[in-house]
């Protein structure tokens, strides 16, 4: 029996037991498909996050504090960090509080429950780069000024999603309600992503003390305060981080009460987490491949056992 005859016989056997053949292949199909989908999604998410971190720049430093420390009687506040910026201009160029506000966003009769509201100072916008510390740029209008922040003005800068969804692209000078308080839109950020609800484009920036009065204090990693600083360049980021850590340790007397990370470290930590998650998910998906392989071996064994007599007759006839 030549190869062509063997192939035709195999196809005939598959057609005879269509359900058995389909179920045998299903395990392998699911396993291979799951691995491909997981790897594709994981790589896509990793690339997206790396792109977001690259937009921030390599000179961003994030500071989070969690209390008064072992022997301290006070927290480090933004004035302490302002002093650092003034004292070390060769390493640090700016600092701003970064307050996540618990605000209910409403325009006329529409609520925007997934819109993020953050309180920042005027230093959040960098005049030299014409963008924020996180890489966002203005499409129109202006950003918060020192006067806005110092006088607690009810003004805001909104993202592209809100500008389109609420104001149909004509947002400047319009009023939006934050927890019942009217805020005037003075600036609109450029579109940075898919401009969907809850995305990075669905954001509002207001003076940080206004945000604090809305009832906040819950930061990204527990109760405390969060600050953003910028170093003079990528090369000075590590030295700038050391200066900030030294100042925080002086107040808290323990590194357990604060965390300082550069944008490069944040990106590395995120990539490590994503890689670990992908390994776990791929391992789980690979179980389907193993189960599918065992299923194929089982069916092959059963098929051969069932057709032992037929195989013997064919061999005796010279097959």
Regions found by a protein language model. Give the residues of each.
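Residue-level signature of catalytic and energy-coupling elements of molecular machines
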Residues: 17, 45, 84, 125, ...
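Hydrophobic, regular-secondary-structure patches
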Residues: 42-116, 123-126, 146-147, 164, ...
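Mechanotransmission and gating elements of multispan inner-membrane complexes involved in transport
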Residues: 74, 86-91, 168, 177-182, ...
């Amino acid at each position: 029996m030549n190869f062509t005859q063997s192939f035709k016989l195999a196809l005939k056997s598959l057609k005879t037991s269509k359900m058995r053949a389909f179920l045998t292949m299903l395990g392998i199909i699911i396993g291979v498909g799951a691995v491909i989908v997981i790897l594709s999604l994981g790589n896509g998410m990793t690339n997206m996050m790396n792109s977001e971190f690259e937009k921030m720049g390599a000179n961003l430093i994030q500071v989070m504090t969690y209390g008064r420390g072992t022997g301290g009687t006070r927290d480090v506040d933004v004035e302490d960090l302002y002093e650092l910026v003034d004292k070390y201009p060769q390493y640090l160029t700016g600092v701003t509080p970064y307050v996540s506000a618990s605000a209910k966003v409403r325009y006329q009769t529409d609520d925007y429950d997934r819109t993020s509201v953050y309180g920042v100072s005027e230093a959040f916008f960098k005049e030299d780069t014409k963008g924020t510390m996180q890489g966002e740029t203005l499409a129109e209008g202006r950003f918060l000024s020192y006067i806005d922040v110092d006088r607690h003005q009810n003004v805001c800068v909104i993202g592209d999603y809100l500008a389109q969804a609420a104001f149909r692209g004509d947002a400047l000078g319009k009023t939006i309600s934050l927890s019942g308080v009217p805020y005037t839109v003075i600036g609109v950020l450029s579109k940075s992503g898919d401009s969907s609800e809850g995305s990075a484009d669905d954001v509002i920036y207001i003076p940080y003390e206004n945000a604090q009065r809305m009832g906040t204090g819950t930061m990204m990693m527990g109760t405390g305060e969060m600050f953003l600083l910028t170093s003079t360049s990528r090369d000075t980021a590590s030295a700038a981080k050391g200066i900030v850590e030294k100042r925080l340790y002086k107040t808290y007397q323990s590194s357990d009460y604060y965390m300082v990370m550069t944008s490069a470290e944040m990106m590395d930590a995120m990539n490590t987490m994503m890689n670990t998650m992908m390994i776990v998910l791929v391992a789980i998906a690979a179980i389907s491949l193993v189960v599918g392989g065992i299923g194929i071996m089982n069916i092959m064994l059963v098929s051969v056992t069932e057709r032992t007599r037929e195989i013997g007759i064919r061999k005796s006839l010279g097959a």
